Structure formats: C-alpha cells, structure tokens
Amino acid sequence: MGASSLVAIRPPREGLPKPALPNLRGLDRDELGEWMAEHRPGPRFRATQVFEWLHRHRAQRFEDMSNVARADRTHLAEATSLDALTVDTVQRSSDGTRKLRLRTLDGHAIESVLIPNEGRGLTQCISSMVGCSLTCRFCATATLGFIRNLATWEIVDQVYRAQDMLAQEAADAQAEYTARITNVVFMGMGEPLHNYAQVRRALSILTDEHGAAIAGRRITVSTAGLVPAIERFGREGLGQEVGLAISLNATTDTVRDHVMPINTRWKIGELLAAVRNVPINRRRRITFEYVLLAGVNDDPADARRLGGLLRDTGGQLNVIPFNPHPGAPFARPEPARVQAFVQQCRRQGLQVHVRTPRGDDIAAACGQLALEDSK
C-alpha cells in the first residue's frame, strides 16, 4: 500500500492547539452546565444564560452579558477566554458568492464560503480542518496535506464571524439585517468525519435552540467515505438530525482507488452497505456527490452503473462538473457530455441535480479551496 493510501485511511492525530484558557464557545450546553457546576456552583439556568450570550448574541466580552451576575462574569473572564477567529480577507465573486479567509490563534489560515440561496438567505460552507487528512486527487485542499484538526469553537466561529460581518455590512448601509445564514454545509477544508468529536459537538451547538438555532434539516455533513465513522454517525442518530452527503465520484473500485485513495481501504460496496444502514429522517434523502471528470468517470456506462448502485438507497445524486485548479490532472467535461450523462442517470430512475459552479472565479467552488500561505 502506497504512502498516499496510508494518509487517506488513518485517522489523524487530534492535533488541537492547547489554549492557555478554555474557550467556552467550544462546549455544548450540557458541557457548559457541567463546567459551571464544577467551577462556579449555582442555579443551572445560569449556564443557559451564558450559552445564549456565547452563541445567540455572539458576545465578544463577558461584561456584555448583562443578565449574568457581575461576580460570575468576573470569574468567567479570569478563568476562560472568548478568543475568536480573525477575518483576513473577503473575496467577492461575480455571482454573489464570497470567500472568507480566516486566521486561527496559532497563525493558520482556513477558508469558508458564503453562497446566496435561490430564495432568501445564505448557505455557508465551513471547514473542519486546516488542510485535509485525505488525498482525493481532484481536490485542491488535498495538496495542502493535513496540518491539524479545528477545535469545536473554531468550527462554529466560522459561522459567527460571517454573521457579524453581514450584520456590520447592514449597519454600515443603514439597512435591515436580512442576509442571514440559513444553511450550513460541512464541505469546506478537511474530512469532517476524521474530526468526529469536534464536528459532533459543533452540530449540537449550531442546532441548539438556545444557540445558533439553525434547523438540523438545513445542515449537511459531507464525507469521502470513512465507513466506521459513517456507522457511528448512524448509531448516534445523527442521520435523524442532519443531512449526510457521500462523495462517491466513481462507479468502479478501480477508478475510485485512483481518484480517492480512501477507496483502497473501504470499497464502494462496503461504503454503500454502511450508508444503507444509517437511519435518516423520512423527509430527507442521503445525497451522493459525483464530481464529473472528463474521460475518467463521465461515460454513459458510468451513468448506468450508478443506477444499479444507488437505486435502492433512496438517495439523490448531485452531479458536479469538475472545477479546475492549478496542477489538477483532470478537466471538466464539455456541457453536452454533462447533459448526456445526466439524462442517462435519469433514465436509470435517479433523482439528479446538477450543481452550478458558484464562486469559481475566486477559487471558492467545490474542490477549489486551497491556501498559498496556510501557515
């Protein structure tokens, strides 16, 4: 087994920075209650008050927590931190998409993308790692290698920094704050299920009615196919709470081994067996993502095989014409080739959506997130 395959299948070491003080934004509501009971005993409702200030109001200073007792605020300020990510740059696409480059406390850069919805609101694509632990050959992030996992607070803070930016823009324009983040997808830098514990906690915070209060049906976690983690996702009932997307990208093990080395460990059959066993909300479907690569996986025979592979999953297929990036060994198929592939998939009885590239002029489209100065 080659070195790239080893990188693709081994869960990375946690690799989280060790803060001088704990960041309370990284605790879910139950954990915050336990922390306060241990360090500042008192009525349990105080933890909910603090949690709301941290995640609903996005407080940057403990002194702003006006309904929390002064003595409690003083203790929290001395024993914990409210550190936040820093927004380095914001790039704007001609289609309204924006790419945020954010800086961590230890100097690393990550990227997050804001995409206008067809209706109202925005979808935010967030990262779970600095770099990525996998080696998918069509993805620019893979060229960075794995640097470290993001802590829970760094995951949720991507949403909060974007929300604060949008609110400030509205205030500067003396307009109503209406450009709200309504959807979140874990499709940025990193493999979310290789950072399972931190992502799981972030989901709890983002969906908490006292926190960010984003409906679980509006959140999707994407994975390249870590079978044990998918099985855990199912056992813990996450499929009932949030959406699951599987990055499939091939219909044979030979091709998937080539474009996604993780397949050398868990073959397509094993992956789909795990997916079929994930209990999901009856109003949702598992999404299968298929990056269309010219001359690699875009043959009509691939479309026919997809019908056989996915027909009994009840899932939907997202076809994503490849988004080029420097050094990539692939090309985007011609539009007629894409259309023929989609039509063949529909003849197989599949529900198919073709994802229109968003933000590709600022390298913000699917598979394009990468950094020249990642450290």
What are these model-derived regions, one by one?
Residues 93, 127-128, 222, 247:
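Short linear Ser/Thr-Pro motifs
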